Design a protein with these regions (language model features):
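A short, charged, and often flexible helix/loop element on the N-terminal side
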Residues: 52-69, 85-87, 123
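Short beta-alpha junction loops
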Residues: 58-60, 90, 113-119
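Active-site proximal beta-strand in glycosyltransferases
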Residues: 83-85, 102-118
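N-terminal subdomain of nucleotide-sugar transferases
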Residues: 1-58, 79-81
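Short, well-ordered alpha-helical microsegments
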Residues: 91-96
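A short acidic, helix-capping loop that chelates divalent metal ions and anchors anionic groups
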Residues: 24-27, 117-121
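Short, high-confidence coil segments that cap the C-terminus of an alpha-helix
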Residues: 81-82, 98
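Membrane-proximal helix-turn-helix segments that form the acceptor-binding/catalytic region
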Residues: 75-79, 122-136
């Protein structure tokens, strides 16, 4: 009988991006004080051995400031992760475009809550296609 080689896989680590306070919500969920569906599967990931690096959420009135902050946090995160897992693309649009252009190599997984529709103009449609190319 041939011996099977056992390979030890590194546990998967994701960067969990959410537009609300995730760490606090997750701790409240553990104490049955917060609904789990708002955590978009985070409690189940841990059960399957998937480690999470939590995004440090901050609120901004300006979407541009949110994008700059979130992009900086994601690109300069000191903790190692293999996948960017987001509950929304709001705030991480620059990272998605970097992925579409091949400048950000980690896969991006997003819960997209609305239908993808064709844009009205040619230029908008091309930008939209490029944007969605950045989402795995």
């Amino acid at each position: 009988m041939a011996e099977e080689k056992q390979t030890s896989l590194k546990p998967l680590t994701i960067y969990f991006y959410h537009t609300r306070l995730t760490r606090e919500s997750y701790e409240e969920w553990k104490e049955y004080k917060f609904p789990g569906h708002i955590l978009y599967g985070l409690p189940l990931l841990e059960k399957h051995g998937i480690r999470s690096v939590m995004h440090k959420c901050r609120y901004f009135s300006s979407r541009l400031r949110l994008m700059l902050y979130a992009t900086k946090e994601i690109l300069f995160c000191k903790e190692k992760y293999q996948v960017l897992y987001a509950t929304s693309f709001r705030g991480i649009e620059p990272v998605i475009f970097l992925r579409a252009l091949g400048l950000y190599r980690k896969p991006i997984v997003i819960w997209h809550h609305t239908a993808v529709v064709n844009s009205s103009g040619f230029a908008r449609e091309q930008i939209s296609r490029l944007f969605y190319k950045g989402i795995d």
